[in-house]
A protein has these predicted regions:
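N-terminal leader/targeting peptides and immediately adjacent processing regions
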Residues: 1-31
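Amphipathic protein-protein interaction modules
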Residues: 56-95
């Protein structure tokens, strides 16, 4: 099942993160941008910071990305092998896998920085 809420994306945090949802979502998108930029691409900000808008914006970005560039981007984001296999089902599961991975990075940064 694909995550559709902030809570499901940040479920890796055993204890709730002490930040408002809007701030968590801003940190999540900042991490997405950081990884995409470090892979040599750029992505604009979504119209709103909601989880679904971020997912739709990332989906459009991936659909427009040249196919030869996708493996390098996924390597940079550090998407799991199982998520790569799910990408064969389409970009939608891959988008959520990317957002979940980025949420893990945000959680680790908040906990250990």
């Amino acid at each position: 099942m694909l995550p559709t809420t902030v809570e499901s994306l940040f479920a890796v945090a055993k204890e709730p993160l002490e930040l408002p949802e809007k701030e968590l979502l801003t940190l999540l998108w900042d991490q997405v941008e950081r990884d995409i930029n470090s892979a040599g691409f750029s992505i604009s900000k979504p119209h709103s910071i909601s989880v679904n808008d971020q997912a739709q914006h990332l989906l459009r970005f991936l659909e427009e990305l040249p196919s030869h560039a996708l493996p390098g981007l996924l390597y940079r984001i550090d998407v799991s092998e199982s998520a790569l296999f799910s990408s064969m089902e389409g970009f939608q599961p891959l988008v959520w896998s990317i957002l979940q991975r980025e949420a893990i990075k945000v959680t680790l940064r908040l906990r250990f920085s």
